[in-house]
Regions:
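Short active-site oxyanion
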Residues: 31-34, 64-65, 88-90, 156-157, ...
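Active-site metal-binding motif and surrounding structural segment of the metallo-beta-lactamase
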Residues: 43-92, 178-189
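Cap/insert and terminal regions of metallo-dependent hydrolase folds
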Residues: 71, 146-157, 162-252
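Metallo-beta-lactamase
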Residues: 93-145, 232, 242-264
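Glycine-rich phosphate-binding "P-loop"
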Residues: 1-13, 129-138, 191-200
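Pepsin/retropepsin-fold aspartyl endopeptidases
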Residues: 18, 73, 78, 89-98, ...
Length: 265
């Protein structure tokens, strides 16, 4: 499948993209892992998975499910790497995928269970749920999923791939539709899609200011958030968890390759 994608790419060697491993500890002390998106370039993601041990986790069945947040190339085209190590893994996608996107999963060699998540809330396990936002996105993509986690004695932690639905809607949806510890929005992680190309518009300042009402205690950002946005978060006094920038990230304001964020700290 990657050979087809590579042939049709303008820049097939682009190593940009987004993928993260989510580890959730239950009330009984058991850890469940989900792989959240899978990046863009096959070779780069295979290298990263090997470096971080994701390849062995996939092969050994230590990752319970693969969550594909949306159909964009920088989150999805390296899926053949996932299928290479875990062709039977349970995958979750929005039910808005186009036929071509669905064919890519099959062409990659996936033969496991496949859940197509409808609009709204989809419980994954106690205290953890996906939410599918039906929103139009650039490049003929429609629909994106995010993850909400209710952390005991702490509050809500939200994880997003690109947040094309908008960061304010992302936060407001949780507040209106979910119940969580202390009625507290504790943490946020992922690509926040405010100014991904750093073409800052003064109206984006309203989005930065708008986050203040949630009194977040831990924020981790990267990918499409935008370098200017990340710096504005820092300047505004938000509790941004810094990365190491040891694998080509342009700033420590981003959590990059191999970096870790924990909720609570």
């Amino acid at each position: 499948a990657w050979a087809i994608a590579k042939e049709n790419c303008v820049h097939a060697d682009n190593a940009g993209g987004y993928s993260c491993l989510v580890e959730i500890e239950s009330m009984e002390g058991e850890t469940t892992r989900y792989l959240f998106d899978t990046g863009w370039n096959y070779d780069w993601m295979d290298t990263c998975f090997k470096r971080e041990g994701i390849d062995n986790m996939l092969a050994n069945g230590e990752i319970a499910g693969f969550i594909q947040t949306h159909e964009h190339m920088d989150h999805y085209w390296a899926f053949p790497v996932v299928a290479k190590y875990a062709p039977n893994i349970h995958i979750y996608t929005p039910n808005t995928f186009y036929p071509e996107g669905k064919d890519y999963i099959k062409a990659a060699g996936h033969v496991g269970e496949w859940t197509e998540v409808k609009k709204g809330l989809y419980p994954l396990q106690p205290g953890v749920a996906l939410y599918q936002f039906e929103c139009p996105i650039i490049f003929r993509v429609f629909g994106e999923m995010s993850l909400y986690c209710n952390v005991k004695d702490v509050g809500l932690v939200s994880i997003t791939g690109c947040c094309h639905q908008g960061i304010i809607l992302f936060a407001d949806t949780a507040y209106k539709e979910l119940k969580y510890e202390k009625d507290k929005f504790y943490g946020l992680y992922g690509g926040l899609h405010i100014s991904p190309f750093d073409d800052w518009d003064p109206k984006y300042d309203d989005l930065v200011i708008g986050l203040k009402k949630w009194n977040l205690e831990r924020v981790g950002c990267n990918h499409c958030t935008g370098l200017i946005t990340a710096q504005k978060f820092v300047d505004a006094g938000y509790p941004v968890v810094k990365g190491t920038a040891r694998f080509r990230s342009k700033t420590t304001n981003y959590l990059g390759n191999g970096d870790v964020i924990k909720f609570p700290a």
